[in-house]
A protein has these predicted regions:
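Charge-rich amphipathic alpha-helical interaction elements
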Residues: 1-125
């Protein structure tokens, strides 16, 4: 499947913005986890805190991976435009379907983690 260069570039920029938002969200979530940690010493709470800390680390790593892939896609689009600038906004390129799927999967998993953390915090704060 093909997509216009302009449209794919715009979508990649949107993915970059989303990843920046999720990075900020992770910082907020880490702060909340630390807050719960400082107020509770129960074994059950400690185990869940460790779980959330590990999950947030994994999600941060995944954000870094996705950001790198998005940047590579943008660089490839820009290189294609520089190589042949004639009618660049009307040309089509191979769509980034796999990358789009990766972003969507990340968002689904991240949002599930966020809901799980909110439920946990409601119980222990």
């Amino acid at each position: 499947m093909e997509k216009k260069i302009y449209d794919l570039n715009l979508e990649c920029r949107e993915w970059q913005n989303k990843m920046a938002f999720y990075e900020d969200d992770i910082k907020i979530m880490q702060g909340r986890v630390e807050e719960v940690n400082s107020k509770n010493s129960a074994t059950e709470v400690r185990a869940m805190i460790e779980h959330f800390q590990n999950q947030l680390i994994l999600q941060k790593e995944q954000i870094d991976i996705v950001k790198k892939k998005v940047k590579q896609q943008i660089n490839a689009l820009e290189a294609g435009i520089e190589k042949n600038p004639v009618a660049a906004d009307h040309r089509s390129v191979e769509d980034a379907t796999a990358l789009r799927d990766e972003v969507e999967t990340f968002e689904k998993i991240f949002n599930e983690l966020r809901k799980e953390l909110i439920t946990f915090m409601a119980k222990w704060m």
